[in-house]
């Protein structure tokens, strides 16, 4: 009987690890797109301003280099505007954040399931049914999740393995709990 609980626990732990990684990758992909959006938006504003300054300057002077520079800056401004039309970075940020939030919910369900496995207050079959329900939701979520990049995977690796995101000391947890719930 204990062997059945162990087998189920191993499977749930494996799924839990996968969900932790998937959640962090989706978060990092959203961060990447948000950074790109901020950068492109800043460049767009700067190039639009410089284009206006260049055109106004042409009223007062007729220098060829100013015309060429204004045309180049205008081209960059048009390119960035076209890029924003082709790739809606804000929608991508939202899609990845949404997937990350759904994965967080699944992660919490798996954590609860691991606790129930350890308590052994339910039968293995009941726990396996709960696990199956979670897996079905997870399969749908993975099918609908937006694609991520290798860069997001690398950032997630750093966050989880180097910075130890999602790991808390007892002291950090105690700071956010009432005294009666502190671990001593």
Label each region the model flagged:
Residues 1-46, 83-184:
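Conserved non-transmembrane functional hotspots
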Residues 62-75:
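Hydrophobic alpha-helical transmembrane segments
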Residues 45-56, 72-82, 106:
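Hydrophobic alpha-helical transmembrane segments of multipass integral membrane proteins
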Residues 60-64, 87-88:
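Membrane-interface helix caps and helix-loop-helix hairpins in membrane proteins
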């Amino acid at each position: 009987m204990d062997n059945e609980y162990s087998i189920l626990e191993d499977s749930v732990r494996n799924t839990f690890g996968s969900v932790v990684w998937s959640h962090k990758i989706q978060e990092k992909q959203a961060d990447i797109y948000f950074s790109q959006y901020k950068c492109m938006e800043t460049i767009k504003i700067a190039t639009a301003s410089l284009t206006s300054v260049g055109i106004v300057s042409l009223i007062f002077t007729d220098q060829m280099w100013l015309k060429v520079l204004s045309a180049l800056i205008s081209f960059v401004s048009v390119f960035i505007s076209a890029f924003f039309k082709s790739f809606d970075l804000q929608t991508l940020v939202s899609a990845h954040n949404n997937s990350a939030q759904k994965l967080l919910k699944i992660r919490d369900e798996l954590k609860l399931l691991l606790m129930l496995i350890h308590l052994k207050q339910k039968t293995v079959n009941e726990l396996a049914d709960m696990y199956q329900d979670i897996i079905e939701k997870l399969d749908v979520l993975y099918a609908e999740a937006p694609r991520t990049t290798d860069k997001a995977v690398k950032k997630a690796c750093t966050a989880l393995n180097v910075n130890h995101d999602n790991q808390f000391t007892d002291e950090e947890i105690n700071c956010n709990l009432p005294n009666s719930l502190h671990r001593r």
